[in-house]
Design a protein with these regions (language model features):
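N-terminal beta1-alpha1 cap of cysteine-dependent amidohydrolase-like domains
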Residues: 1-58, 63-70, 179-188
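A secondary-structure boundary/capping signal
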Residues: 8, 78-80, 103, 137, ...
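Hydrophobic anchor at the start of a short beta-strand
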Residues: 26-27, 75, 166
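Redox-cofactor binding/interface segments in oxidoreductases and associated redox assembly factors
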Residues: 43-44, 77, 169
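Cysteine-nucleophile active-site neighborhood
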Residues: 49-123
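Amide-donor transfer/coupling interface in amidating biosynthetic enzymes
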Residues: 109-188
Length: 188
């Protein structure tokens, strides 16, 4: 089938390019009618989580995507996408903005600061080895539920998690030349 990429805002084109390099067909989700296209996995890109959440809700895609993820559809969520998956946000971050809420994690938005706090590093990612990681106004995971596996940490903070069919990253693998995270996603 194909991988759907949420294309309402954010770094969706970069994910599409990375997946195309791996031979994957992508479809863009811009409105509810796009949900009728055949796809069997989903990418939630980085960008602005508040904007993405509101658009998912207003465009009628929030509930259908939540149901598909809960039903086992593999999902790769990066940066803002991780925030969309989070079941809980840190108290000062939770303004009631619509989210998918399918991953049992507590997330802090913009945990690494503003744009000037952005950085690049390498991480040990379970299942992939040492990978490059670009953090841009990135969140991190404060707390994980019992069914959530920590895949990577940075400076003691959880920045990559997996819960069954859901892979959540605080960083942007689509911005680096390394395909292993997208390969890991395609293997789910």
């Amino acid at each position: 089938m194909a991988t759907a990429v949420l294309a309402v805002q954010g770094a969706f084109a970069e994910h599409e390019a990375k997946l195309a390099e791996l031979g994957e067909t992508c479809v863009e989700l811009r409105q509810a009618a796009d949900l009728t296209q055949p796809f069997d996995r989903l990418v939630l890109p980085g960008g602005e989580s508040t904007t993405q959440g509101k658009l998912l809700d207003e465009l009628g895609m929030l509930e259908p995507l939540r149901e598909r993820i809960a039903g086992g559809m593999p999902v790769l969520a990066t940066c803002a996408g991780l925030i969309l998956l989070a079941s809980r946000l840190d108290a000062h971050d939770d303004k009631g903005t619509p989210r998918l809420g399918t991953m049992d994690v507590l997330v802090r938005r913009n945990a690494y600061g503003r744009q000037l706090g952005s950085f690049h590093t390498e991480l040990e990612l379970a299942g992939a080895g040492t990978v490059p990681a670009t953090f841009i106004r990135a969140p991190f995971v404060i707390e994980t539920g019992a069914g959530v596996q920590t895949l990577a940490t940075c400076d003691g903070n959880v920045v990559a998690v997996r819960q069954g069919n859901q892979l959540g990253l605080a960083f942007h693998p689509e911005l680096d030349g390394d395909p292993r995270i997208h390969e890991l996603f395609l293997s789910l």
